[in-house]
Amino acid sequence: MKIEQIYTGCLAQGAYYITSGGEAAIIDPLRETQPYIERLKKDGVQLKYIFETHFHADFVSGHLDLSRKTNASIVYGPTAQTEFDAIIAEDQQIFEIGDVKIKVLHTPGHTLESSCYLLIDESGNETALFSGDTLFLGDVGRPDLAQKSADMTQNELAGLLYESLYHKILPLADEITVYPAHGAGSACGKNMQKETLDTLGNQKKTNYALNQKDKESFIKEVTDGLLPPPAYFGMNVMMNKKGYDSFDEVLSQGLQPLVPEQFEEIAEVSGALILDVRSNGRFAEGFIPQSVNIGLDGDFAPWVGALIVDVNQPILLVTEKGEEEEAVTRLSRVGFDKVLGFLEGGFDAWKKSGKETDAVHRISPEQFEKEIHQKEVKIIDIRRESEYNAEHIHEAYSKPLAYINEWLHTIEPEEHFYMHCGSGYRSTMAASILQARGYRNFTEIEGGFRAISLTSIPKSDFVCQTKILK
């Protein structure tokens, strides 16, 4: 028997590859199937089952393409309703993979169909729990995402989650290894640890949600402080339920090279968003007017989903050479399949063709320090609220990037302001969106709060240990 965790850091997502006796199972695969196909060929095994822990909201799963290519059966937990062929398992149902077994544990709460998969090894021992979004390390699945489809309140769903965890998961043996669907950085929870596997025994001791005195306390704790989910979550659920275009077709279309003249014409005719995925430093130096920057070198896919409102938005890509396929792939993981092509030769080709360019006005933290001592200034901090609360510049306003589509309308076009994030990754995103919407009355601070913290600019007292995120 072999268990392999295939962890994708930029999505904070874990898929699982299990083999035994010439057969295999994959749990919660990502959109692109090639990594799994390669493993199956290398190991000389037949994929028998594709297990889904629930209808994912934060990414589009690869279950359909993988099933088409391997003839493996797709398995969901009880109550799931799909528009494609799938086994809708019963609670406690057993599936055999070679010499091992997987038992379905129906654990509603995060969603109604949410299920965990308990692995029973060749000796009959319960050894691993693939817990999906029911149980994370340090947290549990948020109970607010399925309110509409379940016709239940988040408190009612949280009550179901309590029953699932306390009656089905906690009685399991301490030595069982927990393999969750997500880790720190995912929007599917609020308090996840950076580790990607742990023993159930340790989680029983350390996970706040597993140590509540009663159901009421549990409901209060798990619903407190939940931020609104990204807009793309609902569409991803629908794609996972109903189906989607083949990833191979999406990739083929997205990898169409376009010379500057073609690129410009298609942008005008289609109304495509020009998405520049270069680093924030490269983008700030020069870019195509109206383009939006979300760098591949950060949490690319989640920010795409948070900032681009419509998953059906046509997209044209500007990339560094050789990063075209990576960009199309990562867009498809969150359901953005309408990539029309990429700028052949990148931004350099655009410049050489003599076409109009733009740039972001940036200054160093040292220059910023001089300027704030010379005049009264307005400062906008676009980090997450938790980062702002931990430590921030005196008099800075908190306006998180995730909500820029709401707060940018409150900006006075004639009032100048300075803007920063944690490192420069997010503030350049914000700068690109602001300039695309016609706002030019701001200055971005290079290096973000990390760099600012090295100056003598007055700051609030440090309140708690907070990871400064990109």
Question: What is each PLM-predicted segment?
Answer:
Residues 1-46, 117-132, 137-138:
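Conserved beta-strand hairpin/beta-sheet module of binuclear metal-dependent hydrolase folds
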Residues 18, 28, 54, 66, ...:
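Divalent metal-coordination and catalytic microenvironments
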Residues 26-27, 47-56, 74-79, 106-109, ...:
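Active-site neighborhood of phospho(di)ester-bond hydrolases with catalytic His/Asp-centered motifs
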Residues 29-30, 55, 79, 111, ...:
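Active-site metal-binding loops of divalent metal-dependent hydrolases
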Residues 33-75:
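Active-site metal-binding motif and surrounding structural segment of the metallo-beta-lactamase
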